[in-house]
């Protein structure tokens, strides 16, 4: 935290019991090295997800330039995938994919279509999401109630 919250970090540091060799100021300390090695499969999975996200961002930017959407949360994203990419993305819940891509909804479709990007076997298309804007999360949802909240936000707020 020291590079970002330097004053708060220094205040916390002043309460840490001092050991021989410790510096007076937290910003002069070295960062500890991670003890656990990175899981190769985990890293590969997230590298792939981020590559897909890069392709999605390009499609969203084009939709924004075409005035189809104003912000990415106004988008319903359709991903056209070959079988392998479809099976990979289908392991991730759709609401989590929507959060990852910062859109209101994600639809997976097996087959060809959409704008091709760097990721092999993937095409993407963006359209304006159906429904109304939730006042809390700003996602577009057909089931936004009279209180202006989507079912998820209403549940979180206990309404």
Each language-model region and where it sits:
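A glycine-rich helix N-cap at a beta->alpha junction
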Residues: 93-111
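Flanking scaffold residues of small Cys/His-coordinated metal-binding clusters
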Residues: 129-132, 144-145
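Beta-rich accessory regions
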Residues: 85-91, 148, 156
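Structural preference for alpha-helix termini/caps and helix-kink/transition segments
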Residues: 2, 132-135
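A carboxyl-terminal module marker
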Residues: 116-118, 129-130, 152-155
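Cys/His-rich microdomains that often coordinate metals
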Residues: 141-144, 154-157
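Short cysteine-rich clusters marking metal-coordination/redox-active sites
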Residues: 134-137, 150-153
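Acidic, turn-prone loop/beta-hairpin segments
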Residues: 1-59, 63-87, 107-109, 114-124
């Amino acid at each position: 935290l020291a590079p970002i919250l330097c004053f708060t970090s220094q205040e916390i540091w002043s309460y840490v019991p001092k050991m021989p060799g410790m510096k007076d100021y937290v910003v002069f300390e070295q960062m500890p090295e991670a003890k656990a090695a990175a899981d190769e499969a985990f890293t590969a999975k997230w590298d792939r997800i981020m590559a897909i996200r890069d392709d999605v961002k390009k499609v969203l930017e084009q939709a924004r330039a075409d005035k189809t959407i104003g912000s990415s949360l106004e988008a319903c994203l359709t991903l056209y995938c070959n079988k392998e990419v479809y099976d990979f993305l289908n392991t991730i819940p759709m609401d989590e994919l929507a959060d990852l891509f910062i859109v209101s909804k994600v639809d997976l479709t097996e087959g060809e279509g959409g704008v091709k990007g760097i990721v092999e076997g993937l095409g993407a298309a963006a359209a304006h999401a159906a429904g109304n804007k939730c006042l809390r999360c700003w996602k577009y949802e057909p089931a936004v109630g009279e209180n202006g909240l989507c079912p998820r936000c209403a549940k979180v707020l206990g309404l």
